[in-house]
Amino acid sequence: MLTREQAHELLDLCFDINGDEKRKRSKTGELPTTFFRFSGHVNNIEIDVHEKGWDRDIYPEKCFAIWLAETYGDTYEGVKDYLFQLKKMTAELALETVKQHDIDYMSMSVLYHRKEVLSNDIFKQ
């Protein structure tokens, strides 16, 4: 089962991972891409994750399904923990991308606009 607040939290984590720009391999390399879908007719949420970036004809590495009023499917805690870890890895990968391609700090926000996700230690490197 999933509350509305928990659904919003999962959506926020997907935005933290994706940013709000288009995300596909040709633009952002291997930064993860998330897909978040709510199906009102069955009252469930599905989250697909392309861990190495989205590209045509490539299936997601992870697919989650959570029902708002049922007890089957994936658990909120399990999906949240996975997305939180992916969010941290995305922050580190975005910084590595910036370092490898000698992109200035302002350009980094295009790759990953949620800089508050990155810890101060990562920015000091």
Where are each of the predicted segments found?
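An extracellular/secretory-lumen and virion-surface interaction module
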Residues: 50
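Negatively charged, low-complexity tracts enriched in Asp/Glu with abundant Ser/Thr
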Residues: 1-44, 53-125
